Amino acid sequence: MESQSIFDAKSFLKQLTTRPGVYRMMDARGEVLYVGKARNLKNRVSSYFRNTGVSIKTRALVEKIADIEITITHSETEALLLEQNLIKTLKPPYNILLRDDKSYPYIYLSSHDEYPSLTFRRVRQKKTGKGRFFGPYTSAAAVRESLALLQKIFRIRQCEDSFFSNRSRPCLQHQIGRCSAPCVGLIDPQSYAEDMSHATMFLEGRNPEIINETIQQMEVASAQLDFERAAVLRDQVDYLRRVQEQQAIEGVARDIDAFALSSSLELVVVHGLFIRAGRVVGSKSFYLSERLESDDGDLLSSFLNQYYFGEHAIYGLPQEITTTVGLTDKDALKAAFKEVFNRNVRIEHNVRSNRAEWLHLAQTNANQALSTRMQSQDAQLQRWQSFCDALNLEASVKRVECFDVSHTFGEATVASCVVFGPEGAIKDLYRRYNIKDVPAGDDYHAMEQALTRRYSKLKDSDVGLPDIILIDGGKGQLGIAHQVFDELQITGVTLIGVAKGVTRKPGMETLFISADNSILNLPGDSTALHLIQQIRDEAHRFAITGHRNQRNKKRTQSVLDAVPGIGPKRRRDLLNYFGSVRNIERASLEEIKRVPGISEVIAQTIYAAFHE
């Protein structure tokens, strides 16, 4: 049986590229469900929507898909690395269920206080340990090659802590010049820290900075007549210069942000491709619906100004920015980078070689994103029209609002109101209502309070009333809405109750329509029903998120704030020390006594509050 989904897979797949890349599957809330890579995007994504041969887990994923975003890459290897970075950043829930058991090779910098090590690690999505990870690398061989080079240049230890702690004399690595033997004190912590700092900079691709610093340290060592140390530093400089020359020959990229622009009459897409040390670590499409600038150079300049100075640059400021069009205020932007960040950033649009390839890739992704978004908007408009037709409504319907109530056995009751128009959600008009002074678990009175608070203000405001109000519930909730509107003397708004079927499965909903007191059951594959489900599910998400926040806040406050002698300062000290109320609850009396500013008497009072 074909899975029910609000996503129009057929239209999406029709225009999907066959090139390699990464795909991100998202639900109706815009949250990423799953990230995957593909040698052929069209073939791979199509496989999820087959009618046969699909696992139960995959079918459950497909039922939740509301949108799919893609990023085109040069190769499958590049797609693999980008996939891993996105999984690490986004932590999609279905990747735990659907990804294979493959792990990726990293270089791991340990957290040892004086003498940290660099070692080979294979890790999955959640990396353990307090140290720092560099990677992922394309292969284990690439990691081992990098580690061998780091040993040769910086002589950083690569042994395990247990081996390091039990040495009484240097090992073979020291004898062949690949370790400075910190285990037996043949290098002081300060010198080792300098070598480790340079090794870290090397992994970050900052070779010119290392060379300059090392030359300065070599000159200082010579002036202090420490010729042995000076010779070691001289060899490091020689190695680094050779590596730098080799990288220049191979065309290894610096840290680059590549931006491309694609536009239609109604929509502009700017796609950013983020390259760090020669690898694509991320990408993102930005949609600009209102175009005030007529020139592409003006538009991209305005966008970059907001992107870098508005705290949107999640990968930081790069060494270089490349764009598909020349920026009208390039010099002003470079001067602003220098003034605000004290960084000299190169900005170019006429580029060659690797930079041209990155820019071409960004342009390909921008074009694809524009095509997908325009098709998505067309599909949304079609769903809206289907919704109006199915309910025999006029085409002039511009706004639908939907309400839901969420609580846990009457605790922290919150009602939500979400707003949709022909082009989708209008999140600026969303509202939550913390319900007060109603019997615990009484959804009817909670809905009455939310509707009264919403429309007693809205009926006289500039925003105006919606055309349709959806109530998540059957005749009972719809009756409450009628009662509120009669009391507020509001007319001209169509009220619709959305009741789940007996099985409570999507596709079995019953609609109670107030305009003519009719009852409507739409078929499960109806695009009108898909839109109603999308709006209702969004109202549910918005309500339950608000409820959980209120519940957690209430539970956090109720225990600590009720303890005699605990004011704002002591409460803050306790939370800073333990990290959470749950950890305070788990703590022993002796552990509570150790908190600065908490006396033995207060500690006993706190412990008793949680355990009696």
Curated annotation (Swiss-Prot):
Mind listing the GO molecular function terms for this protein?
Answer: DNA binding; excinuclease ABC activity
Predominant place of localization:
cytoplasm
Q: Does the keyword DNA repair apply?
A: yes
The GIY-YIG domain extends over 18-96
The lineage's top-level taxon is Bacteria
Q: List the disulfide bonds.
A: none
> Is this entry keyworded Transit peptide?
no
Q: Name the SMART domains on file.
A: GIYc, HhH1
Q: Name the InterPro entries on file.
A: GIY-YIG_endonuc (IPR000305), GIY-YIG_endonuc_sf (IPR035901), GIY-YIG_UvrC_Cho (IPR047296), Hlx-hairpin-Hlx_DNA-bd_motif (IPR003583), RuvA_2-like (IPR010994), UVR_dom (IPR001943), UVR_dom_sf (IPR036876), UvrABC_protein_C (IPR050066)
Where is this protein found? Answer: Cytoplasm
Entry's family note: Belongs to the UvrC family.
Q: Which PANTHER family match?
A: UVRABC SYSTEM PROTEIN C (PTHR30562:SF1), UVRC/OXIDOREDUCTASE (PTHR30562)
Q: What's its job?
A: The UvrABC repair system catalyzes the recognition and processing of DNA lesions. UvrC both incises the 5' and 3' sides of the lesion. The N-terminal half is responsible for the 3' incision and the C-terminal half is responsible for the 5' incision.
| Name the UniProt record assigns to this protein | UvrABC system protein C
